[in-house]
Design a protein with these regions (language model features):
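Extreme N-terminal starter segment of soluble prokaryotic enzymes
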Residues: 1-4, 40
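Ordered hydrophobic segments in well-structured contexts
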Residues: 4, 8, 32-34
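Gly/serine-rich nucleotide phosphate-binding loop at the start of the catalytic core
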Residues: 6-16
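Short, solvent-exposed amphipathic alpha-helical segments in soluble enzyme
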Residues: 20-22, 59
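Glycine-rich phosphate- or other oxyanion-binding loops that anchor nucleotides, phosphorylated ligands
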Residues: 27-190
Length: 190
């Protein structure tokens, strides 16, 4: 059965999609862009909690897939524990949400780092300190995808790369580097 891989942006998936040996062909352009090879569906959700949850629900109704993988960028918070490193990949073990009325925590595995998801960018020092009370990594889609996976009975795993740690970072340059590193993980894509 196919695995569904969710990216927030095309930029994150760019090198994987461009690599001919992976054999991805675009099969859908609206309402979400989707590519497929023999092993995976790649779905571009758009940025944010709402886009991620809607894309997951749409994909779950339109395509047959088994396990789910969310791959993408994450920011470093001002977490008081073991720090995360810029440019490094982290497997996510737990996902929580910064937004009110989203108190559930999702355990994705025993090993890895915690991730907190936010409905808006976490870019100021104060915002990073607040997010750091919950997890060392922050994104804008993980919680929504974990919640949707639970609703649709899918096992989800997540891999995030630290692309930013302050408002002054070159997040777009770092995401391009991340995309190149993702494409080097051949076993995931073929």
């Amino acid at each position: 059965m196919l695995r569904a891989v969710f990216f927030a942006t095309r930029m994150e998936a760019e090198r994987v999609l461009a690599e001919k040996k992976f054999g991805y062909k675009q099969i859908c352009a609206e309402p979400f862009r989707v590519w497929r090879n023999r092993r995976n569906l790649i779905v571009i959700t758009g940025i944010g909690l709402v886009n991620a949850s809607v894309a997951f629900a749409w994909a779950a109704r339109k395509f047959r897939f088994g396990d789910v993988l969310n791959v993408g960028a994450a920011g470093a918070t001002a977490f008081g524990g073991k720090p995360v490193e810029m440019g490094k990949f982290y497997k996510i073990s737990k996902v929580v949400c910064l937004e009110p009325y989203n108190e559930m925590a999702f355990r994705l595995g025993r090993a890895g780092r915690a991730l907190v998801s936010s409905g808006s960018p976490v870019s100021t020092r104060e915002e990073r300190e607040y997010a750091g009370k919950f997890a060392p990594l922050v994104d804008m889609e993980g919680y929504a995808l974990a919640r949707a996976a639970e609703v649709f009975g899918k096992k989800i795993s997540m891999v995030k790369m630290v692309t930013d740690f302050s408002h002054e970072c070159d997040i777009f340059g770092n995401i391009k580097k991340m995309s190149e590193k993702f494409a080097q993980m051949e076993g995931v894509w073929i």
